[in-house]
């Protein structure tokens, strides 16, 4: 049984979508690490830092379908992080004795931080897409309820009357602000 609510079969869907959970799953996280290792090798090959064929050979096998997950889990618990055990497996998978060039010149933190950024980028795309839908729904609510009275609230008590449409417009303004900022961040 999971000790985390986000991994719970009962509660998990209440706190996140399957799409978002997939981005941060173990399998996808390892794939991000492999993607970074492959990209690093391709660039280093192109620059002549490692043999020219290494980038392609490492990229060919940078997939999670061959990973020995039990070994990765066991070695990670010993080492304290998954990069060394992953690179050990990756270097054995690369043909033509080119495995020695896996992870060339990189640190564990380089790989993990870069993969984290890629995960966050992909998660941000989902959030922005969701916010577009929320904005559309809020715009409809603003128009529909612009003249529907309700009690205003301040300091956890009733205040001057307002409209539900106006209340929705304040939520909408927040969404507009955040989507603008998030879209700007996405392309920086």
Functional labels for PLM-detected ranges:
Residues 2-180:
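A helix-coil-helix interface module used to build multimeric assemblies
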Residues 178-188:
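Single conserved hydrophobic/aromatic residue that forms the stacking wall/gate
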């Amino acid at each position: 049984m999971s000790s985390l609510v986000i991994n719970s079969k009962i509660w998990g869907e209440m706190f996140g979508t399957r799409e978002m959970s997939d981005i941060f799953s173990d399998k996808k996280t390892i794939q991000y690490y492999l993607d970074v290792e492959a990209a690093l090798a391709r660039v280093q090959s192109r620059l002549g830092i490692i043999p020219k064929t290494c980038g392609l050979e490492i990229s060919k096998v940078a997939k999670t379908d061959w990973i020995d997950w039990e070994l990765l889990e066991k070695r990670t618990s010993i080492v304290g992080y998954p990069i060394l055990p992953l690179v050990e497996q990756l270097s054995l998978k690369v043909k033509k004795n080119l495995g020695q060039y896996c992870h060339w010149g990189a640190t564990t933190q380089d790989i993990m931080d870069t993969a984290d950024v890629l995960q966050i980028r992909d998660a941000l795309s989902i959030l922005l897409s969701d916010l577009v839908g929320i904005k559309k729904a809020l715009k409809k609510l603003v128009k529909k309820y612009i003249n529907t009275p309700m009690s205003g609230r301040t300091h956890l008590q009733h205040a001057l009357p307002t409209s539900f449409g106006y209340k929705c417009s304040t939520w909408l303004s927040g969404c507009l602000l955040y989507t603008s900022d998030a879209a700007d961040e996405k392309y920086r």
